[in-house]
């Protein structure tokens, strides 16, 4: 089993002081054995949870399972697509988290046995746990969009998981002729970071305005309304007049199928052929949540809103984008807040204490143009 180290993001760091202050109130009276808490998923939520657990009780044995040795953050990745930022600025290793005494297993989890409380890793290693936290993020729900599968992402990138997909979409925009049509297909809710498609349209428009001003952007949307809509529309009319068109659900904007061979996108009322097709498909909880049995028929994970305990599995908690968390948006800041609250709930449960309803926040900060002119 390989071990790496981790560096966290800003949202996690901001919560450290609050976690430390809560530690004196939430320390468990441990029995003979040291409780083993395992977190699957090293994104914002999982990392925040693992770190908070150790800070709330340094005696806990905390393991973070994450197959990627480098974390590539989604926030600000739209700026990478628009050429305003480079991908390495989005990437972080796992050094600092493990320096806090957290074991980071650089393997994918392949199976969870809730009755035996064990996790099988891709290399055959089996880990035992007392409490398990699932923070698997999202996966694309390919079955929900005819014509779109893993292979299609190489022609029609979603770029909804930051990394190679981000760079593929950027390269396609750079290679597109002036006057080309960029189509962004937006799915119905729930989805990761609901305002992000419109930020993406804005920043792609910024790139095209400077480099390929004859080009257009068409947003095909499976929703009628979206977060911060008036602000985006105002920015589009002022900064990119005539460049961005949006077709909403009631106007026939829902994408019903795609053809990667021709870059054709089919909607309820028309077909469109794109020079660059950014297809963001419907989403669901990360695959391990389904394998474990924590996801329901919706593809997402029902939880107790106070403790984040799974409603389908004992001794399992679910946080972040994968969870059905009421009105909280699926965002990085919300995932980090849930991770810290979940850690407190676990520590209180081990101590036999009740958990108060957490006060959670979630924020999505969107950019419609760079603060200073780009070169």
Language-model segments: residues:
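Glycine-rich dinucleotide-binding loop and its adjacent helix/turn
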Residues: 136-211
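Sec/Tat signal peptide C-region and signal peptidase I cleavage site
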Residues: 27-31
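Glycine-rich, N-terminal phosphate-binding loop of Rossmann-like dinucleotide-binding domains
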Residues: 16, 136-137, 186, 269, ...
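Beta1-alpha1 glycine-rich phosphate/pyrophosphate-binding loop at the start
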Residues: 32-103, 188-230
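N-terminal secretory signal peptides and thylakoid transit peptides that target proteins
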Residues: 1-20
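C-terminal, flexible cofactor-proximal segment of oxidoreductases
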Residues: 346-375
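FAD-site-proximal beta/loop scaffold in flavoenzymes
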Residues: 150-178, 272-337, 348
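A Rossmann-like FAD-binding core segment of flavoenzymes
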Residues: 100-111, 127, 206-299, 354
